[in-house]
Amino acid sequence: KEEVTLIKPREDTTQVNNYEYDQSVVCTGAFSKSLVRQIEGRFIPLETERGYHIEFIEKQELLSRPISLVESGIYLTPLHNRLRAVGTVELGGLHSEISQARIDYIARDAKRLLPSLQDYQKPWLGYRPTLPDCLPVIGKSPKFKNIFYAFGHNHLGWTLGPTTGKLITDLICHGSEISSVYSIDRYLS
């Protein structure tokens, strides 16, 4: 695994190697902001939503299907020998510490419904790339004809990733058009 630290019009630099390419797609989710700044020389208002979940290791099945605690926004999903509890989101950037208060909130509500739950394991925090208009950036760099963008899908990255991949592939390989509503120009002009 290598982290891209610099993108130039025909070369990517990682911590280990330099790679030359004909085209490059910046599809690094919440980590796209700094790469766009290097490439375009401009700031984009990409923020990081941080979503939390915890897991309870359980020997017996406590739920037969996923459920939602509507009033608190917590969701419980049974998995093999464990129960995942998810909920809460915050705008917190990439470098802030995990919020123990948010973890405790999820645990408290899960235990309110299922008092027999053991102590939670594996607190987790995920980064979701979010733009002010809630639309992703999909399309060409206005500065370099061989650099393309595909990021900013909020909570729907896994859901929209395949469609975005198809759009970018068609753009690069066939010159297909992508609606200007997804253009990075909306933040650079």
Task: Identify the residue ranges that each predicted region occupies.
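Short secondary-structure transition/capping segments
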Residues: 12, 131-134, 186
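A conserved short coil-to-beta-strand element within the FAD-binding core of flavoproteins
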Residues: 1-15
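C-terminal lid/capping helical subdomain adjacent to the catalytic/cofactor pocket in oxidative enzymes
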Residues: 137, 141-189
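Generic recognition of long tandem-repeat/solenoid scaffolds
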Residues: 14-16, 85, 148-150
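Short, well-ordered beta-to-alpha junction loops that form the rim of enzyme active sites
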Residues: 2, 88, 153
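Active-site substrate-recognition segment that forms the wall
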Residues: 6, 19, 23-145
